[in-house]
């Protein structure tokens, strides 16, 4: 099973692609889709749509995973995340991919085992679970990988 996770944003969208096979979880690819600060919102969202579509074409994942938008005190940030999430959902739908939206609590519980885990604890566990030398950067990438891990564990009943 190939799982692609996205941590959406209009400036930086982290992504991670994992494979769950008989030998466990393996990394296919991870990275960040970034847009220049001078681009308008329309251009940024169009670029994001094209890049997400390319990843879906290239890796043909079984499922697209994202985190449910949580309450954010900064309304502009929340709107930008929602716009990016909508573009990713549209790309997934056009590629006929299953879409799974996880809550922050689900991710924390499955990756760390503690519902009040910090961002640093989640990032550390991503590094350990995937046997990486370093924590993936930027943070958005580690978050996207955590979403993939959480989805896989959820499917296994962990």
UniProtKB/Swiss-Prot annotation:
**Cellular component, GO annotation:** cytoplasm; Holliday junction resolvase complex
| Catalyzed reaction equations | Endonucleolytic cleavage at a junction such as a reciprocal single-stranded crossover between two homologous DNA duplexes (Holliday junction)
Q: Which residues form the signal peptide?
A: none
Record's cofactor remark: Binds 2 Mg(2+) ion per subunit.
Q: Which domain of life is it from?
A: Bacteria
Work out whether the entry's keyword set contains Transport. Answer: no
Subunit field text: Homodimer which binds Holliday junction (HJ) DNA. The HJ becomes 2-fold symmetrical on binding to RuvC with unstacked arms; it has a different conformation from HJ DNA in complex with RuvA. In the full resolvosome a probable DNA-RuvA(4)-RuvB(12)-RuvC(2) complex forms which resolves the HJ.
Quote the protein name from its UniProt record: Crossover junction endodeoxyribonuclease RuvC
The record lists the organism as Dictyoglomus turgidum (strain DSM 6724 / Z-1310)
Higher taxonomy:
Bacteria, Pseudomonadati, Dictyoglomota, Dictyoglomia, Dictyoglomales
């Amino acid at each position: 099973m190939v799982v692609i996770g996205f941590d959406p944003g209009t400036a930086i969208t982290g992504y991670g692609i994992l494979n769950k096979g008989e030998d466990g979880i393996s990394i296919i690819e991870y990275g960040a889709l970034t847009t220049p600060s001078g681009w308008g919102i329309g251009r940024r969202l169009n670029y994001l749509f094209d890049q997400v579509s390319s990843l879906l074409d290239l890796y043909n994942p079984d499922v697209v995973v994202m985190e449910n938008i949580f309450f954010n005190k900064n309304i502009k940030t929340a709107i930008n995340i929602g716009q990016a999430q909508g573009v990713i959902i549209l790309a997934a739908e056009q590629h006929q991919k299953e879409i799974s939206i996880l809550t922050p609590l689900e991710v924390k519980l499955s990756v760390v085992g503690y519902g009040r885990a910090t961002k640093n604890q989640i990032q550390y566990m991503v590094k350990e679970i995937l046997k990486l030398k370093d924590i993936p950067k930027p943070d958005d990438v580690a978050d996207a990988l955590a979403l993939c891990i959480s989805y896989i564990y959820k499917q296994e009943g962990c």
